[in-house]
A protein has these predicted regions:
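ATPase nucleotide-binding modules
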Residues: 244-281, 288
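Helix-to-loop junction immediately C-terminal to a conserved catalytic motif
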Residues: 68
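The feature captures the beta-strand-to-loop junction immediately N-terminal to the Walker
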Residues: 53-55
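Single conserved hydrophobic/aromatic residue that forms the stacking wall/gate
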Residues: 1-15, 279-288
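ABC ATPase nucleotide-binding domains
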Residues: 92-96, 100-247, 251
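Conserved coupling/switch loops of ABC nucleotide-binding domains, chiefly the family-specific signature
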Residues: 74-77, 127, 227, 261
Length: 288
């Protein structure tokens, strides 16, 4: 619905006046003696779509939970809208989160699920109905409002989960691997919808995934993580064409980039790359 889309877009444009960035400074997190995040520094421009990408156990979901206020930090600060929210409760951070498991209440219908957060915040009935109408039309779930989650497809459930976040008009959207439970065809469709959503609303998004295709197609920026450290934070094009280190070069792409060990030498104003490939006798026999 074009009018619903324009209405929501206007709301988010008004919200973004004066909004700066999400800024993370020198952030560290330990679980006991295990260091999960190490001196993370990250700044996200308003309206950007940042994807946190990395292998399992790299710390990306922990970082997202810290932004949401679901995890405490050992060192550093988190700023939203120029305010230090490091010790602010999740409900007071003006963020909305979409989970991998949808996290819909099975006993509630779509309408009740979408407006639950607004009712908890004691928003007026008129405002609730206004937001519900706009968002449900925008996400094309307005015909599903009386259905229970068990009566919806995976894609419909994901749209409802996104709608529940949208009605709150948050400063920042946090997505925690929202498409990983969907089949391949539906993942492609939902990627397209999330991309369209961001292009129309221009909201600030932090999105966690281990799927490179998702990251490259959705993000305006990608922060690649490994062992609790951001290896590179750049545009998808630069991540792919100009990796900052061998981990990024080997991690991105299928097949990954070929890496050859060698030495750079300068002599007589010329630079040469010298390498020596050594083979075992078995490998040499195979080559013959």
């Amino acid at each position: 619905d074009d009018s619903a889309s324009r209405g929501l877009g206007d709301v988010y444009k008004r919200q973004r006046i004066g909004m700066k960035t999400l800024k993370i400074e020198e952030l560290s997190k330990n679980f006991g003696s295990t260091e999960v995040l190490r001196k993370i520094n990250l700044e996200i421009d308003e309206g950007n779509f940042l994807v946190l990408l990395g292998p399992s156990g790299c710390g990306k979901s922990t970082l997202l939970n810290i932004i949401a206020g679901l995890e405490t930090i050992n060192e550093g600060n988190v700023h939203i809208d120029d305010y230090n929210v490091s010790k602010v409760e999740p409900k007071d951070r003006n963020i909305a989160m979409v989970f991998q498991s949808y996290a819909l209440y099975p006993s509630m219908n779509v309408r009740e699920n979408m407006i639950f957060g607004l009712k908890q915040a004691k928003v007026s009935k008129e405002k609730i109905e206004e937001q519900l109408e706009k968002v449900s039309k925008f996400l094309q779930v307005d015909a599903l409002l009386e259905r229970k989650p068990s009566q919806l497809s995976g894609g419909q459930r994901q749209r409802v989960a996104i709608g529940r976040a949208l009605v709150r008009e948050p400063r920042i959207f946090l997505f925690d691997e929202p498409l990983s439970n969907l089949d391949a065809k539906l993942r492609v469709e939902m990627r397209r919808e999330i991309k369209k959503l961001h292009q129309q609303l221009k909201t600030t998004v932090v999105y966690v995934t281990h799927d490179q295709t998702e990251a490259m197609s959705l993000g305006t920026n990608i922060a690649i993580m490994n062992h609790g450290v951001i290896q590179q934070n750049d545009t998808p094009e630069n991540i792919y064409n100009k990796p900052s280190n061998t981990f990024v070069a080997d991690f991105i792409g299928s097949p990954s980039m070929n890496l050859i060990k060698g030495n750079l030498k300068e002599s007589s104003n010329k630079v040469s790359f010298n390498t020596c490939l050594l083979y075992t006798s078995d490998a040499a026999d195979e080559r013959r």
